[in-house]
């Protein structure tokens, strides 16, 4: 059946609509952009020719099919055996390649014979019929501008060149690009769109900024890391500093305690070793701990020899330190023999008394003291020293007991130490004797041997001021009538004397003219007939102090404490020996301040204090005013009516240290 004219006309209109159809860019499901490629025209009848599109008597038809990008690339790769990178191909170049390669548009646009350029034969038809199918506009000037942006150059034939404008621009256009070549679609990836100078500059600036930002970020990361490390180090240093200060505080406390220990030890050793403090009194070792056996044999733990002042302080201190170090290193079990402990006695003793003189005490004393000393014997039952932890004090007796007819029995072995000087030791007996205010003794029938001495000027008077202060209460009795003080009789003494120094009456001023009388002389008379004749004799030469004995338990405790103390300071004994040996001990004590120079301080020259003497608090406020005003002394409720009152010398009212002696068989006073 032959198609009618209407059918032919309808087919032509459909083909025309198909040719003039404007394709739309769609996005597939996978997100890939679709491009349009030229397809081969379908088979048509011979009479179905496109009349309007025919130029120069040639007619053709073009069908455009929308295909995915991958299919287009495969088509290009199969045709040219070359691979093209789809991601780098602009859409404009792909559409331009499809337009030039379309065989149906050869009458409008086609390749040059050389294949290096393409020609647009009819720009009017190209902008009217071709551009709307591939682009969204039909502006030929916009197409030319796009070609210039991608580097295409307009080619002008030499035959038509010249300064005058011709009509060839409207009739014919030719463009070329080194990478837009016929049959070489792989070169399309090398065609790049031109960028403006501002865009290039902005891009360079952005790149430089990005590089700088990366550098800054790297530096910031490094700085953060360094800051973290510094913070860790600071925390560590802070902790170490805190620990160091804590250790320093503990070391300071320990150092302060050690300084206190060594100051006490140095003060004690200096006071013991210094021979210039007193010409009559010396001090023996550190607490005179004598390990004596009851049988009298001298062992390795026997008591140390008494210090000799002629050997010098250097040798004494060195010997003392060596002995202390040796005793602390000695085993504790070897220190006590025969189940006995140390004998602790007063460290004050007189020069020249040898330990040999302490051997036989029964040559000097009677049976009573020998019986008391029997507790130190080796044999027999358990003594009282072993039963009681408290020290046992043996009461001494005067050596004048032989004058009253007492039997003198000498013990075989007896250690006599010098104890503290007290009124109980001086005035032995049940009660005190009587003595009038003038110093006369009823037993002797005459004045006592006490004498007065004029008060010294300068430092002597000032030193006597403190000494005389305990006896200022005696001035109350000056204006009162003479009276006696009751007291008991002591068999060891043949005279009367008060039991309290505060009860000594004030001596009138006319007695100060007697040079050989002393105000307070404690008489130890051997015979009543010779008591008044021996005025220059030492009143304390035949006195002695009790011996203090300790129980073994207390001895062990004391020895253990001493051992622990000296063991803790053993490492510093060598340095302490060097310190003591380098000191000039000859000048020590020369600049000792007087008592009244430092108010409230103890007298460094006062060796012993009487137990029954008035306390310092009773006369502390009045002793400074006692000798300043010669008229009246209204202080603490008493007055001195005598304006001629003068202070007594220091040795008259209270000696520096009463002469305490341990009797020896060779003493001529014991005969």
Curated annotation (Swiss-Prot):
**Subcellular localization(s) per the UniProt record:** Nucleus; Cytoplasm
**Protein name as annotated:** Heat shock transcription factor hsf-1
- Coiled-coil intervals, chain numbering: 206-240
* GO BP terms in the entry: ascaroside biosynthetic process; dauer larval development; defense response to Gram-negative bacterium; defense response to Gram-positive bacterium; determination of adult lifespan; innate immune response; negative regulation of gene expression; nematode larval development
Annotated region described as DNA-binding domain, given as residue ranges: 89-196
The induction text for this entry reads: Induced by heat shock.
Q: Which gene encodes it?
A: hsf-1
Q: Which GO terms describe its cellular component?
A: chromatin; cytoplasm; nuclear body; nuclear stress granule; nucleus; WASH complex
């Amino acid at each position: 059946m032959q198609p009618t004219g209407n059918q032919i006309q309808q087919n032509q209109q459909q083909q025309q609509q198909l040719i003039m159809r404007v394709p739309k860019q769609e996005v597939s499901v996978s997100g890939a952009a679709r491009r349009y490629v030229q397809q081969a025209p379908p088979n048509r009848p011979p009479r179905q020719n496109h009349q309007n599109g025919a130029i120069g008597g040639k007619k053709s038809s073009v069908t455009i099919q929308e295909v995915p990008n991958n299919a287009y690339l495969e088509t290009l790769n199969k045709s040219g055996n070359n691979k093209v990178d789809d991601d780098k191909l602009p859409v404009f170049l792909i559409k331009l390649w499809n337009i030039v390669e379309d065989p149906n548009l050869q009458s409008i646009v086609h390749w040059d014979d050389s294949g290096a350029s393409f020609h647009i034969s009819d720009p009017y038809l190209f902008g009217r019929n071709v551009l709307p199918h591939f682009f969204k506009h039909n502006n030929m000037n916009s197409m030319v501008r796009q070609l210039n942006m991608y580097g295409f150059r307009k080619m002008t034939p030499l035959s038509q060149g010249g300064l005058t404008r011709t009509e060839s621009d409207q009739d014919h256009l030719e463009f070329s690009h080194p990478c837009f070549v016929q049959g070489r679609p792989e070169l399309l990836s090398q065609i790049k769109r031109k960028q403006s100078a501002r865009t290039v500059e902005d891009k360079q600036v952005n790149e430089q900024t990005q590089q700088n930002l990366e550098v800054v970020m790297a530096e910031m990361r490094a700085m953060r890391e360094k800051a973290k490390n510094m913070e860790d180090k600071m925390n560590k240093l802070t902790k170490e500093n805190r620990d160091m200060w804590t250790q320093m505080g503990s070391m300071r406390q320990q150092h302060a305690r050690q300084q206190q220990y060594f100051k006490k030890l140095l003060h004690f050793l200096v006071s013991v070793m210094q021979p210039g403090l007193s010409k009559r009194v010396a001090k023996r070792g550190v607490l005179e701990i004598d390990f004596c056996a009851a049988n009298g044999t001298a062992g390795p733990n026997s008591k140390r020899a008494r210090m000799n002042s002629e050997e010098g302080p250097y040798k004494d201190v060195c010997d003392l330190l060596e002995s202390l170090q040796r005793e602390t290193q000695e085993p504790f079990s070897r220190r006590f023999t025969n189940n006995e402990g140390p004998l602790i006695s007063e460290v004050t003793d007189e020069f020249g008394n040898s330990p040999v003189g302490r051997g036989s005490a029964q040559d000097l004393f009677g049976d009573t003291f020998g019986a008391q000393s029997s507790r130190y014997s080796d044999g027999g039952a358990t003594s009282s020293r072993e039963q009681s932890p408290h020290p046992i004090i043996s009461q001494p007796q005067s050596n004048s007991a032989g004058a009253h007819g007492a039997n003198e029995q000498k013990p075989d072995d007896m250690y006599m130490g010098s104890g503290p000087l007290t009124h109980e030791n001086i005035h032995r007996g049940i009660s005190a004797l009587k003595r009038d205010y003038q110093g006369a003794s009823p037993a002797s029938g005459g004045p006592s041997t006490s004498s007065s001495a004029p008060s010294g000027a300068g430092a002597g008077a000032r030193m006597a001021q403190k000494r005389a202060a305990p006896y200022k209460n005696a001035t109350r009795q000056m204006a009162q009538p003479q009276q006696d003080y009751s007291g008991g009789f002591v068999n060891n003494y043949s005279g009367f004397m008060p039991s309290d120094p505060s009860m000594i009456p004030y001596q009138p001023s006319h007695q100060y003219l007697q040079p050989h009388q002393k105000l307070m002389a404690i008489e130890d008379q051997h015979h009543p007939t010779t008591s008044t004749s021996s005025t220059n004799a030492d009143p304390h030469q035949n006195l002695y102090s009790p011996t203090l004995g300790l129980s073994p338990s207390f001895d062990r405790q004391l020895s253990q404490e001493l051992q622990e103390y000296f063991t803790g300071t053993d490492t510093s004994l060598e340095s302490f020996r060097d310190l003591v040996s380098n000191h000039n001990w000859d000048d020590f004590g020369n600049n000792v301040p007087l008592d009244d120079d430092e108010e409230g301080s103890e007298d460094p020259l006062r060796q012993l204090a009487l137990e029954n003497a008035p306390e310092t608090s009773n006369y502390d406020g009045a002793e400074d005013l006692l000798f300043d005003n010669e008229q009246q002394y209204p202080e603490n409720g008493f007055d001195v009516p005598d304006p001629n009152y003068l202070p007594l010398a220091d040795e008259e009212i209270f000696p520096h240290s009463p002469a305490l002696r341990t009797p020896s068989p060779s003493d001529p006073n014991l005969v």
